[in-house]
Amino acid sequence: MLSGLIQRFEEEKMKHNQERVEELSLVRVDDTISQPPRYAPSAPMPSSMPTVALEILDKAMSNTTGATQTQKAEKAAFASYAEAFRDDVRLRQIKRHVNEQILPKLKSDLGGLKKKRAIIHMTLLIAAVVALLTSVCTLSSDMNVAFKLNGTSAEIPQWFKSLNPMLSVVNLGATFLMMVCAKSERSLNQQIDMIKKEVMKKQSYNDAVRMSFTEFSSVPLDGFELPLT
């Protein structure tokens, strides 16, 4: 039994010595040597498009408040250029193709609304003339106005005075038609202004996308900086 313990002890000692030799045989490598080699950065620099977009928006906001339609169209154009500078290249191309498909439809709708507005405006003018004439005729009959022709006075005939109720109804209808036409024309003006703004935005966006490198050589629209020659 004692010999078995001695033999077991010798085996454990030899195993421990072997593990110690294997551990010492490992070579320690310095951390700086184990790091991968460093290369010069070759990735493109971050795009300056967001900065340009902010500058364009600041330009648009620092102008006047945009009370007129021309100033509102100017702000819409500034916003479209800023959006084009901010978007990704692929998204920019997708928007350009969509705008090219939508613009003819918007222009067609704009032409139809303008024709409709012209018809309503003409109807408004006719109703205004009818309301004015009926008002003058009714007022003259009620006040028994006498007209002088070649030195002789001529009063309004009785049969014409009997038309006052009908003229009053016509005057009321013309006035109501004027109110309806004015409201419709105002609504059409808002729709036309909105469509004009959309057309301006989409055209400005497409113009910004098609801008050549010679016009914007330092900040091209592909999202990367170009070296100045």
UniProtKB/Swiss-Prot annotation:
Protein name listed in UniProt: Non-structural protein P8
Primary site of residence: host cell
UniProt-listed InterPro entries: Orbi_NS3
Residues of the signal peptide: none
Membrane-crossing residue ranges in chain numbering: 119-139, 162-182
Record's GO cellular component terms: host cell Golgi apparatus; host cell plasma membrane; membrane
Family classification: Belongs to the orbivirus NS3 family.
GO biological process: symbiont-mediated suppression of host innate immune response
Entry membrane topology: Multi-pass membrane protein
Sorted UniProt keywords: Host cell membrane, Host Golgi apparatus, Host membrane, Host-virus interaction, Inhibition of host innate immune response by virus, Membrane, Transmembrane, Transmembrane helix, Viral immunoevasion
Domain of life from the UniProt record: Viruses
Species of the source: Bluetongue virus 1 (isolate South Africa)
Classification of source organism: Viruses, Riboviria, Orthornavirae, Duplornaviricota, Resentoviricetes
